[in-house]
Design a protein with these regions (language model features):
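Alpha-helical transmembrane segments in multi-pass membrane proteins
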Residues: 1, 21-38
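Central hydrophobic cores of alpha-helical transmembrane segments in multi-pass inner-membrane proteins
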Residues: 1-11, 46, 73-79
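Membrane-interface helix-loop junction between the first two transmembrane segments
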Residues: 5-25
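Membrane-helix interface/capping segments
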Residues: 15, 45-54, 86-93
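Helix-boundary and loop/linker segments of multi-pass membrane transporters
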Residues: 17-23, 58-65, 99-100
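Membrane-embedded catalytic scaffold of the fatty acid hydroxylase/desaturase
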Residues: 31-41, 64-189
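Juxtamembrane/interfacial segments at transmembrane-helix boundaries in multi-pass membrane proteins
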Residues: 47-70
């Protein structure tokens, strides 16, 4: 909430407001619903992941090694990419994800505009990480970092970031992802 207020204040300061009250309230409400449904996701997927991790994992990665954390972060992002891509290209996934793209504005509150039904399918994409032995607490940590990273890219106040744009999701290229022009729909994930 502090980040949203800071972005709002900055937008007012430079005379480039990216917030509409009704749109922001809708985004915040949807975000709170997702938070509530997240409890169900943690319970259900946590149980499934635990069973996979303890009974079916091919080996156990050592969480004391930095390479485990780097691997887990990159692999999590890889599977997130495929989940996100499927969320655009498959209708059953799109039915859940479309709410995120319905905001009239593009700001940090848009990042919170998430459906409460996404957890029904998103957890499936991360099963391979548990099968190859990524520890649960490493997954929770890198998943949280990924979520934090996804938040800041929903701002119109951050300019292009040079070479970084070529390799990572940034506010600039994610704005294109949220564009509604036919030319840009489903072009970058």
């Amino acid at each position: 909430l502090v980040a949203l207020l800071l972005e709002l204040a900055y937008g007012k300061l430079i005379n480039k407001n990216t917030y509409k009250l009704n749109d922001t309230i809708s985004s915040l409400f949807m975000g709170s619903l997702r938070g509530t449904s997240g409890i169900l996701k943690i319970g259900f997927s946590g149980y499934v992941y635990y069973q996979i991790e303890t009974h079916f994992a091919l080996w156990r990665m050592d969480s004391n090694l930095w390479i485990t954390w780097i691997f887990a972060f990159v692999a999590y992002d890889f599977f997130y990419y495929w989940f996100h891509r499927f969320s655009h290209e498959r209708q059953i996934f799109w039915a859940s994800h479309v709410a995120h793209h319905q905001s009239e504005e593009y700001n940090l509150s848009t990042a919170l505009r998430q459906t409460g039904t996404g957890f029904f399918i998103s957890w499936i994409f991360y099963i391979p990480l548990f099968l190859i032995g990524v520890p649960s607490y490493v997954m929770v940590s890198v998943g949280t970092l990924n979520l934090i990273y996804q938040f800041w890219v929903h701002s119109r106040h951050i300019p292009k970031l040079g070479w970084y744009e070529l390799f990572f999701v940034t506010p600039s290229n994610h704005r294109v992802h949220h564009a509604q022009n036919d030319l840009y729909i489903d072009k970058n994930y």
